[in-house]
């Protein structure tokens, strides 16, 4: 394993890598934007490929752990949630009484989400905001919950995004992050590596005509911090009661924390 392929630690460093490629910090955001402009229309298919179809079950687990109340004026911010997948689940779990704000830096992803919200009759319950997770355009203590699924590994400065999450949450607010993680079962890890590095780029080329985008997504998963390291990063910005659950042999992990 080389320095380029090692996972980052608690001190961060994702801003200097585009997958396994070392880059200048200033390049990171525009390069990631290019990936998601490319895959926006096929985003659910992309997650099906990356997770072997398991992402739907994991997202349901995330919303179940959040347990959104069926009360009006309860507000959730879903970051990097452009297509609305998490927000729709949360709204339905709250019996369509909660209000969701979906924030994404990528306009193509938001466009997909807006169309889906209108199609599903959820548009009145959702605001779509194009902005950066590192600089949220909201006042302090604005939300009851902050969710982010398969997005934080694409943020250049993860520590800054976590600080912003803490800032905009109300006291007693909940943070939940679902992300691909460090597989802890050796045999499963080998099988998943074979799938990821050999099959996924080829399928990405076939389905979305962009194998390079899918190769980046696979490599970015392998660069993301291990579960305990990410938990430490969450705790470091001020969150309390930080915990995580491994999902499907730790192919993914769900981190939870509270602002107390």
Swiss-Prot record:
EC number, as in UniProt: 2.1.1.163, 2.1.1.201
Name the top EC class: transferase
Q: What is catalysed by this protein? A: a 2-demethylmenaquinol + S-adenosyl-L-methionine = a menaquinol + S-adenosyl-L-homocysteine + H(+); a 2-methoxy-6-(all-trans-polyprenyl)benzene-1,4-diol + S-adenosyl-L-methionine = a 5-methoxy-2-methyl-3-(all-trans-polyprenyl)benzene-1,4-diol + S-adenosyl-L-homocysteine + H(+)
Report the pathway entry: Quinol/quinone metabolism; menaquinone biosynthesis; menaquinol from 1,4-dihydroxy-2-naphthoate: step 2/2; Cofactor biosynthesis; ubiquinone biosynthesis
Sorted alphabetically, the Gene Ontology BP terms of this entry are:
aerobic respiration; menaquinone biosynthetic process; methylation
What does the entry list as the binding residues for S-adenosyl-L-methionine?
Answer: 83, 104, 132-133
Alphabetically sorted, this entry's keywords are: Menaquinone biosynthesis, Methyltransferase, S-adenosyl-L-methionine, Transferase, Ubiquinone biosynthesis
Q: Which superkingdom? A: Bacteria
Tell me which InterPro entries the record gives.
SAM-dependent_MTases_sf, UbiE/COQ5_MeTrFase, UbiE/COQ5_MeTrFase_CS
Q: Tell me, what is one Gene Ontology molecular-function annotation carried by this entry?
A: demethylmenaquinone methyltransferase activity
NCBIfam families per record: MenG_MenH_UbiE, PRK00216.1-3, PRK00216.1-5
| Family, as annotated | Belongs to the class I-like SAM-binding methyltransferase superfamily. MenG/UbiE family.
Its annotated function is as follows: Methyltransferase required for the conversion of demethylmenaquinol (DMKH2) to menaquinol (MKH2) and the conversion of 2-polyprenyl-6-methoxy-1,4-benzoquinol (DDMQH2) to 2-polyprenyl-3-methyl-6-methoxy-1,4-benzoquinol (DMQH2).
Which PANTHER family does UniProt cross-reference here?
2-METHOXY-6-POLYPRENYL-1,4-BENZOQUINOL METHYLASE, MITOCHONDRIAL (PTHR43591:SF24), METHYLTRANSFERASE (PTHR43591)
Please identify the protein, giving its name as recorded.
Answer: Ubiquinone/menaquinone biosynthesis C-methyltransferase UbiE
């Amino acid at each position: 394993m080389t320095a380029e392929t090692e996972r980052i630690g608690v001190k961060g460093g994702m801003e200097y890598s585009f997958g396994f490629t070392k880059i200048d910090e200033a390049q990171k955001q525009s390069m990631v934007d290019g990936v998601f402009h490319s895959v926006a229309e096929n985003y659910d298919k992309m997650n099906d490929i990356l997770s072997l179809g398991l992402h739907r079950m994991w997202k349901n687990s995330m919303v179940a752990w959040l347990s959104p109340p069926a009360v009006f004026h309860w507000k959730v911010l879903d970051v990097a949630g452009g297509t609305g997948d998490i927000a729709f689940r949360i709204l339905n779990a709250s019996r369509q009484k909660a209000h969701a704000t979906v924030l994404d830096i990528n306009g193509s992803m938001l466009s997909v989400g807006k169309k889906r919200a209108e199609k599903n009759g959820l548009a009145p319950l959702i605001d779509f905001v194009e902005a950066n997770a590192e600089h949220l355009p909201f006042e302090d203590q604005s939300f009851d919950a902050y969710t982010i699924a398969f997005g934080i590994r694409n943020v250049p400065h993860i520590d800054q995004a976590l600080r912003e999450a803490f800032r905009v949450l109300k006291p007693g607010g909940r943070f939940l992050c679902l992300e691909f993680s460090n597989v802890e079962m050796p045999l499963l890890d080998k099988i998943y590596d074979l799938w990821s590095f050999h099959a996924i780029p080829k399928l990405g080329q076939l389905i979305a005509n962009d194998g390079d985008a899918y190769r980046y997504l696979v490599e970015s998963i392998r660069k993301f911090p291990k579960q305990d390291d990410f938990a430490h990063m969450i705790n470091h910005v001020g969150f309390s009661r930080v915990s995580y659950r491994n999902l499907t042999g730790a192919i993914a992990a769900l981190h939870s924390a509270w602002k107390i």
